[in-house]
Each structure stands twice: as C-alpha cells, then as structure tokens.
C-alpha cells in the first residue's frame, strides 16, 4: 500500500528505533529465483519525479540516510539527517546462517550475475 516514506519513520518499533529510521531489508515476491521483477517505486509529490526499481535479487534494502547529519557535499551543500533514501538490491542479510534463504555462496570459478534497473520518470 503506498505511503509517504516519513509516515512511520519515528514509529514506536524496536528496529526503527535502533536504526534511527529505516534500514530494512524487504523480501521481494518472486515467482522464481533470478526473475527480473518490480521491487519498489518512489515519487516526489512536488516535482512528480518517479523512480522504479526492478531487480533479479531476492531482497531490497531501504535506508533513509539516518546518520547523514552535517555531511558535506559538492559546492558547499550540507546534507541533514534523513535527507536521502537508498534502495539497494541485494541478498538477505546474514544469509550464510540461514539455510532456507537464497544462497549467496560462490565457489572458486563461479560467476555471480544480477541485474538491477533504476527507471526514472515524471508522473502527474
């Protein structure tokens, strides 16, 4: 269900409190391992810019810049806490310790391939 990113960012939830915002891995609904499928969409309500994420990975980490406070950027810009959001397609955290998670193990000679597409647009 769509909602604003900030809606629950200060929720009374242990994981949100520990991370001081979102730093969560979401399990993506896949029909089969390695399937390229939709993962997430964000939209800026002011500019109407959108970003959609498609990936072959089983998980999507969302991080809301919870520790950016005062980080300096280009041209003298300063980034305050929570002034960014990241969508990182990846395997599940702690995968090697959970045999029922999709494997992330690579043996010598193995090739690892994944695809992530970030699609930008404008939507009224």
Predicted features by range, described:
Residues 1-124:
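Active-site pocket scaffolds in enzymes
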